[in-house]
Structures are given as C-alpha cells and as structure tokens.
Amino acid sequence: MSVQPETMPDSSNKTNPTVKEVIAYLADKFPLCFSIEGEAKPLKVGLSQDLAEALADDEKVSKTLLRQVLRSYTMSWRYLACCKANAQRIGLQGENVGIVDEAQAEHAAQSLAVAKEAYAARKAEQRKEQRKDFFKKKAREERNAKTMNKAVKKGSPKKDTFAKATAESLAVLTHKFSKGNK
C-alpha cells in the first residue's frame, strides 16, 4: 500500500491509526530510517525523542502511539535479526550515529530466540488442539456410524415404533374429536 507523505492511510474513518498504519506512515516519511519490507536497520539509541520532536506538530501521531510503534518495530523478528555486533545504527535521516555493541547484539539475539520459542510453543499448542478436535470428531462419527449400523441390523425398530405410535395416536385423536363434533 502506497502512503502519501503527509497522510495516514484511511482505515475506515478510525480516529486512532493502527501500529501497522503508523509504521507505514513513518516508513514513508523517513524512508532511510524505517522500512516495511526487506532488511531493517538498527535504530539510533534515543530515536524516540528525535521522532517525537520531528512529529511534534503532527496531529496524526501521539507520543504514546509513537512509543507503542517503536516498541513493536524494535521487537519484530526482522529488526532483532539485524541487530548484530558492530552493525551501524542510523538516525531519522539515515545518517550513521553509532554501532551496535556486543551486549546489545546479545540482548537482541536472546529476545529473538525467546520470541521464536514462544511462537513455536503457541503453534504447537494450536496443533495439539486441532489434533484433539479432529480425533474427537472422528470418534463421534465412528460412534454415530456404529449406532446407525446397529439400528439397520435390527430392522430399524425405532422407526417402526415411532410410526405405530404416531398412527395409534392419530386414530385415538380422530376418534376422540369426531365424537365431540357429531
């Protein structure tokens, strides 16, 4: 989706744009700093202050929303993967402003590993639930099939019983109401 520099994407007239919409807005406004696709670049430490100052007159994005957006952006797998030791950090206009040190690179690698582990655990739990539901459904279908087979083998007595009861009931009701009407 292409975003014009001074406009936020229209999200069905929402008053608060989503994090993704703001990231798209920032990528359009500061293309040398933020990206939506491809490899991300490590951001300057303290970039949030620079960003808040640069967007101070922008009514579309509040400081709180900027903090949420930066948190989301910097916790993405794409961003964490780019934070390698000695990688260049960049400012809003794409200028080099420092490097990622060993401790920061290790923290990013650990955060990425934890995020991937949590994702794998959620996926495994979802697969477990899907398997459980599948086998419950299969067992239910097998029980129903066995019940139907038993009914067919016995000559479907339930259907005959219901039919006789219905015919007898109708005969009684007809007799009862026909006497009263005559």
Curated annotation (Swiss-Prot):
UniProt GO molecular function: RNA strand annealing activity; RNA strand-exchange activity
Predominant localisation class: cytoplasm
Lineage summary: Bacteria, Pseudomonadati, Pseudomonadota, Gammaproteobacteria, Pasteurellales
PANTHER family: RNA CHAPERONE PROQ (PTHR38106:SF1)
Gene symbol of the encoding locus: proQ
GO CC annotation: cytosol
Example of a GO biological process term: post-transcriptional regulation of gene expression
Compartment(s) of residence: Cytoplasm
Highest taxon in the source lineage: Bacteria
SMART domains for this protein: ProQ
UniProt cross-references to HAMAP family, sorted A to Z: ProQ
Protein name per the record: RNA chaperone ProQ
Function, as annotated: RNA chaperone with significant RNA binding, RNA strand exchange and RNA duplexing activities.
Family stated for the protein in its record: Belongs to the ProQ family.
Region of interest (Disordered), residue spans: 125-160
Disulphide connectivity of cysteines: none
Keyword field: Chaperone, Cytoplasm, RNA-binding
